[in-house]
Structures are given as structure tokens and as C-alpha cells.
Amino acid sequence: MQQFSLSANIEEGQDKDFNYIVTPNAQDVASGIVNGYNSGIHSFTIIGSYGTGKSCFLLALEKDLQSKGQHNLINPQTLSSCKKYEVLKIVGDYKDLASLMRNKLAIDGTADNVLDELRNRYNQAKKRGSFLIIFIDEFGKVLEHAAKNDPE
């Protein structure tokens, strides 16, 4: 029997039985990402209430980007001519973004070190012919932390 859960963790990925149901809204969001990217927008925000499928959307998007077969949301070639996609997945928490990024990237130092490491990973992916995408899920927690601790 298949179990339904309102929450998904993008770092844990999807199990073999992951079956994303593409709704018209999800298709609109995916099309908006592709159209926006192709017109020069490279950062996107997906918002919605708890349990509406934002994390599952990211998992389905990742699956499409890394799949050679059938695509549910987008055909990766409409986004880039790169043959491979690398996805850096971060789940937000009540911490500053630099700390979350340092932890995920397994580095020490300042926010500048984070930017240097991201630049390095981007360049390495590019050398491999890959397209680097960063997913930050639960970003609202990061914003809440910033508002309470360092609103400037």
C-alpha cells in the first residue's frame, strides 16, 4: 500500500515509488521557470501553504532534469543545452543562510568563503558540461531567523 505524506524532504530525495501528479498549477510554475530563465531571470520563488506540494515539485523537477526518459514537468533541453544537471539541495532552518550554506558545502569561514565555493562548484560543473541548480527549500525559516536576529 502506498503511503501519503504532506511533507517531503528534498535532501532525502524521492523513493522508487515517487509518483508526482502534475496539476495545471504545477505545469504553469514549471513553464514560468523555463520561460523566465530563457528571458534572463535566474532566481525563482515558489510559495504556497504547508502541504501544497512545493517540496514534491522540486523533487519532480530534479527527476525531470536528471532523467533521460519521460519528463513530467519540463524537458531539460528547453532550459539548457547542457547534457547533465547537478542539483545542490539545501533545506532551510532557523539559522542564517551563510551557516546553512557552509554546512552544506562542508567549508569553514565567512559568507565570502561560501560565495567562493559556490563559484568553484559552478565552474567545476561547467567544465563537466553540467548545469548547476541550487534548491533552497523551507527558505521562510531562514527569513524568520533573519527578521528576529538581524533585521538589517
Report residues per predicted region.
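Short glycine-rich substrate-engagement loop in P-loop NTPases that contacts/grips substrate
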Residues: L97-Y122
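Charged C-terminal transducer/switch regions of large nucleotide-driven machines
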Residues: E86-S99, R121-A125
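Flexible phosphate/Mg2+-sensing switch loops adjacent to catalytic phosphate-binding sites
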Residues: E62-V87, V91, G109-E117
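Residue-level preference for the first positions of well-ordered beta-strands
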Residues: S43-T45, V87, F131-I133
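Conserved P-loop NTPase "ATPase switch" module shared by AAA+ and STAND
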Residues: Q124-P151
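Well-ordered, non-membrane alpha-helical segments in soluble/globular domains
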Residues: A26-S31, L115-L118, D150-E152
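Conserved catalytic network of the ASCE P-loop NTPase/AAA+ motor domain
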Residues: N38-S39, S80-K83, Q124-R128
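Walker A/P-loop-proximal flanking segment of P-loop NTPase domains
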Residues: M1-T52, L58-L65
